[in-house]
């Protein structure tokens, strides 16, 4: 049976592996992407300094290495191993691929994996057999397994690899043969060992195996990860991967350099900064926007809804203008706060005409029972109000952002070099799909849109150069983009409260997520809770809704379910950006954020709605750019707390702690930001249906 298993095993089935501490000279803590679950197994490489639990990182010159499996939780913490995923054998294959590379590169003589048999899905022996085959086929005969250790312990499965031409007892870190277990007897054929309990003679390898197991049975996995260092960026990278991708050499090249572009801004403030701030903050621009919207709204309420006579249009228009202006007067017109206050005011205004609407609606009744008619009336009113609010927010999103579009049209992009301009034009034109697909691990050289790999490499290099040259937008500006995200990646985002963008991030200075490029279809998320609760359909802020007809497909493949996200991102002033102006499509008011960007999630709002067509799983996410200065790449955390409670606590005392952002704000499910309760209305106005793909790709 074992021979059959090894024949069926595919040696090339390795899984994606992420180095969770890229700062280490010797990579030694990894996550393994086994499936689309939000918790993934990982492993740490380490060594022991004595016969007890005292362990440390691998260093140059070490000869004995230990592999300790663990689970990487969705919160980014390390916990005791819960399982190896659906294919423990593929996990082991991936682990030993890394182990063999490490042993060869750093001249390590022995390596041991100890794993609880209860976590192997009944495949402990198969795992040992597979490891034996891997070592024999990949080491060129230089390494062998100590098979005498396989069946020593009922609780653990042991796998020990050692260099063939080195005696085990001579390797530093391998325990001496235990005098508690064995008596050494000299004989004519050499030393023999007698088991003190049974009196039976055993081979030297059997005595070594028993001594190794005796020492390691006392060790706890908990002690190994008490002082482990992990990278927030690497965790986010591993959790933002889709299961189907093409990890080419170029993908790996650019993945390894992405953090370079998430550093604090070095570019000078753009010349248009003051004009930009004035355009969205001046009373004149707000009055102009309020007047335009009020006139259009008054006419709509007269002609479409027949709420009042034509002679009252001007009076109603003035009233609407005053209501809007009073709501938004203290907020920048492109900010979420402004849109939120505007939405609340418009909602309240429309409610004043509910009796008028009901009078017209009740005239259409055709003898339905009161209970039935009441439900019909409720649904019809909600749909009518939803449709109205979405149109209103759509209008304000475009008109209030008018100054941003005018400024962008006038910008010439002359600060960039010819090659940088070429890269920007290629990205803003038709090349962004292939460029970002390569960075996302989706690019297939046999099926691409317009650019070959060589052309993409040139474009990315030119864009990277443009970011180094770069622009810096003023503080207090919110940029917007949309994204269609698979359910597993979204769930990791919710748990971890951080998201990693592998690709260049196309955003707009205008609130394009509320329908600027199409008919608004998701607009109720900015309302106060009571009003929003009436209009949303999911009734679920952060969770995912699985419709009955999707349950089977979701169980078979969680990536089947997509979540539509509207991003409102603050803090873009913290990093170098590219502001293309006339080098791109100026009416889009595009600002490109760098690849490798990390954002902290501050607020997730349910944006689902039904205005005649149901839109499930639509979310408004408010986030903030985090630079490498704010987000520590490697911090020491208390492993005891991580494993026992899931709480992330930085180590103190004699251990040097690097400057860092408070990680509790990333993992807490109760992250709160002071926002107006009307946020719900705006969220449901998110519309990404007809948006240019570069503002959605990710």
Swiss-Prot record:
Chain ranges of the TR mART core domain: 375-628
PROSITE patterns on file: TR_MART
InterPro entries per the UniProt record, alphabetical: ADP-ribosyltransferase, Phage_T4_Alt-like
Subcellular localization(s) per the UniProt record: Virion
Gene3D superfamilies associated with the record: Toxin ADP-ribosyltransferase, Chain A, domain 1
Cross-referenced Pfam families: ADPrib_exo_Tox (PF03496)
PTM summary: Proteolytic cleavages at the N- and C-termini by the prohead core protein protease give rise to the mature enzyme.
Enzyme Commission number(s): 2.4.2.31
Keywords associated with the record: Glycosyltransferase, NAD, Nucleotidyltransferase, Transferase, Virion
The keyword Glycosyltransferase belongs to this UniProt entry's keyword annotation: yes
Catalytic activity: L-arginyl-[protein] + NAD(+) = N(omega)-(ADP-D-ribosyl)-L-arginyl-[protein] + nicotinamide + H(+)
GO cellular component: extracellular region; virion component
Broad class of enzyme this protein falls into: transferase
Residues annotated as site: Cleavage: 7-8, 633-634
Gene Ontology molecular functions: NAD+-protein-arginine ADP-ribosyltransferase activity; nucleotidyltransferase activity
Domain of life, per lineage: Viruses
Active site residues of this protein: 481, 506, 590
One Gene Ontology term from the biological process aspect of the record: regulation of viral transcription
Chief subcellular location: virion
Similarity annotation: Belongs to the Tevenvirinae NAD(+)--arginine ADP-ribosyltransferase family.
Function: ADP-ribosyltransferase that efficiently ADP-ribosylates one of the two alpha subunits of host RNA polymerase RPOA on an arginine located in the C-terminal region. ADP-ribosylation of RPOA alpha subunit enhances the transcription of viral early genes. Also ribosylates RPOA subunits beta, beta' and sigma 70 and performs an autoribosylation reaction.
Name of the protein: NAD(+)--arginine ADP-ribosyltransferase
Organism of provenance: Enterobacteria phage T6
Lineage: Viruses, Duplodnaviria, Heunggongvirae, Uroviricota, Caudoviricetes
Gene: alt
